[in-house]
């Protein structure tokens, strides 16, 4: 019979720490949130604006595409512009096909980037593969940059896959095609890391990833990879999709892996809707880490889902307003109110669970449900503090939340202590 302890998060897998532009990935450091731009990197204004938005939203590393000379030439200018804005965000260069040439031809780009991403599936083909891989590794060594060896099943090393499929056939097909593909992904990452180390790249300058688009495949591949390597691991479900589907698929797969102690940095690869906000993927990554109890980024707003007792939309509107105010205020609050990330606010819709949930929050309100008296008890630090009445209950509660934050986390409180 399983005990309750069997369902606790497993200890973090031991991994080698990698310094990426001052951000530590692996080695027991908090799981790092990263993202990627979708601008043309050669468009310096657009790329700077998006990197800034992603970083301000909470992305600790930002990856940019470096696919041609114009993009490579823009990288140091992007880095310089960001620094002038006071944004020292590590930039990761995403290279495919000609990364070796771009790094060699643009030394300022090689210097400005905090990390290089190499895809073993398209770094080169046949006789050129190992040579071009080696050239990128040599550039990483020269500029003392870490490398992410990022395998993706959409661009998997076909020579390795064919070799393993043929071996499986010779052995009488003990493995399914899906299992052989998973093994190919893992071997591609491990063999590439082994080659990089043989070329002189230190172990603490290598991060591995092995991305697929199927939830069960991703869980299996990373379980295999984590058992056979102590390299820091970058988690991400590739081509997760749009909207709810992408969020659910990424959260399910990454959540299971992190519960098992696997993963040192994550990216939520959402397909944005036309004109959509690219920072959404950062918010989802932060929410995932926070709801699982691994990190705290922003105060939590607990709110009931509503039912027949809550035909009024007042509690929904108040919960939304509080959540929006908190998120928009966090860039300032992080500096002004240290520790505010731990705050919990409850906005409940009726008497059934409202008072109880509000008592569990730092500050909470139980709004009147259908047929209830037009009064809303407010609980602060587990005790009923007052009852709000009248047409401005929502506005009054917002002022109470602001006052609570100032008193608990402001400089006045720090001085009193």
Swiss-Prot record:
Pathway: Isoprenoid biosynthesis; isopentenyl diphosphate biosynthesis via DXP pathway; isopentenyl diphosphate from 1-deoxy-D-xylulose 5-phosphate: step 5/6. [4Fe-4S] cluster binds at residues 304, 307, 350, 357. SUPFAM superfamilies: Nitrite and sulphite reductase 4Fe-4S domain-like. Its EC number is 1.17.7.3. InterPro entries: Dihydropteroate_synth-like_sf (IPR011005), IspG_bac (IPR016425), IspG_bac-typ (IPR004588), NO2/SO3_Rdtase_4Fe4S_sf (IPR045854). The keyword tRNA processing does not apply. Keywords: 4Fe-4S, Iron, Iron-sulfur, Isoprene biosynthesis, Metal-binding, Oxidoreductase. It catalyses: (2E)-4-hydroxy-3-methylbut-2-enyl diphosphate + oxidized [flavodoxin] + H2O + 2 H(+) = 2-C-methyl-D-erythritol 2,4-cyclic diphosphate + reduced [flavodoxin]. Binds 1 [4Fe-4S] cluster. It is an enzyme of class 1 (oxidoreductase). GO terms for molecular function: 4 iron, 4 sulfur cluster binding; 4-hydroxy-3-methylbut-2-en-1-yl diphosphate synthase activity (ferredoxin); 4-hydroxy-3-methylbut-2-enyl-diphosphate synthase activity (flavodoxin); iron ion binding. Its cofactor is [4Fe-4S] cluster. It comes from the Bacteria. It holds the Pfam family GcpE. One of its GO terms (biological process) is terpenoid biosynthetic process. The keyword Iron-sulfur applies. Converts 2C-methyl-D-erythritol 2,4-cyclodiphosphate (ME-2,4cPP) into 1-hydroxy-2-methyl-2-(E)-butenyl 4-diphosphate. Belongs to the IspG family. This is 4-hydroxy-3-methylbut-2-en-1-yl diphosphate synthase (flavodoxin). It comes from Sinorhizobium medicae (strain WSM419) (Ensifer medicae).
């Amino acid at each position: 019979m399983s005990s309750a302890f069997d369902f606790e998060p497993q200890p973090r897998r031991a991994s080698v720490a990698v310094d990426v532009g001052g951000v530590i990935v692996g080695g027991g450091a908090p799981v790092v949130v990263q993202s990627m731009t979708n601008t043309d990197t050669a468009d310096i204004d657009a790329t700077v604006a998006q990197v800034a938005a992603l970083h301000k939203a909470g992305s600790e590393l930002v990856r940019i595409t470096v696919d041609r000379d114009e993009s490579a030439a823009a990288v140091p200018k992007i880095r310089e512009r960001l620094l002038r804005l006071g944004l020292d965000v590590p930039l990761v260069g995403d290279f495919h096909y000609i990364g070796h040439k771009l790094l060699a031809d643009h030394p300022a780009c090689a210097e400005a980037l905090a990390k290089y991403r190499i895809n073993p599936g398209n770094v080169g083909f046949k006789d050129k593969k190992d040579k071009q891989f080696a050239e990128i590794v040599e550039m990483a060594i020269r500029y003392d940059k870490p490398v992410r060896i990022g395998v993706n099943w959409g661009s998997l090393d076909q020579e390795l896959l064919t070799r393993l499929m043929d071996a499986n056939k010779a052995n009488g097909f003990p493995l399914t095609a899906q299992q052989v593909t998973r093994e190919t992904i893992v071997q591609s990452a491990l063999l590439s890391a082994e080659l990089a180390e043989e070329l002189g790249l230190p172990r603490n300058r290598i991060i591995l990833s092995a991305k697929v688009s199927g939830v069960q495949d991703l869980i299996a591949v990373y379980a295999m990879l984590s058992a056979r390597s102590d390299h820091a691991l970058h988690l991400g479900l590739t081509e997760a999709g749009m909207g709810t589907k992408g969020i659910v698929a990424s959260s399910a797969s990454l959540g299971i892996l992190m519960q098992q102690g696997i993963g040192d940095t994550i990216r939520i690869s959402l397909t944005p809707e036309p004109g959509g906000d690219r920072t959404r993927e950062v918010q989802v990554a932060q929410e995932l880490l926070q709801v699982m109890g691994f990190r705290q980024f922003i105060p939590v707003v607990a709110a009931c889902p509503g039912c027949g007792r809550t035909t009024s939309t007042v509690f929904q509107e108040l919960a939304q307003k509080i959540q929006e105010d908190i998120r928009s205020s966090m860039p300032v609050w992080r500096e002004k109110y240290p520790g505010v990330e731990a705050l919990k606010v409850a906005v409940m819709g009726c008497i059934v669970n409202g008072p109880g949930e509000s008592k569990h929050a730092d500050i909470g309100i139980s709004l009147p449900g259908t047929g209830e008296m037009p009064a809303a008890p407010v609980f602060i630090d587990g005790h009923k503090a007052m009852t709000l009445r009248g047409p401005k209950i929502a506005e009054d509660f917002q002022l109470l939340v602001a006052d609570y934050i100032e008193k608990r986390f402001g400089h006045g409180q720090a001085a009193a202590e």
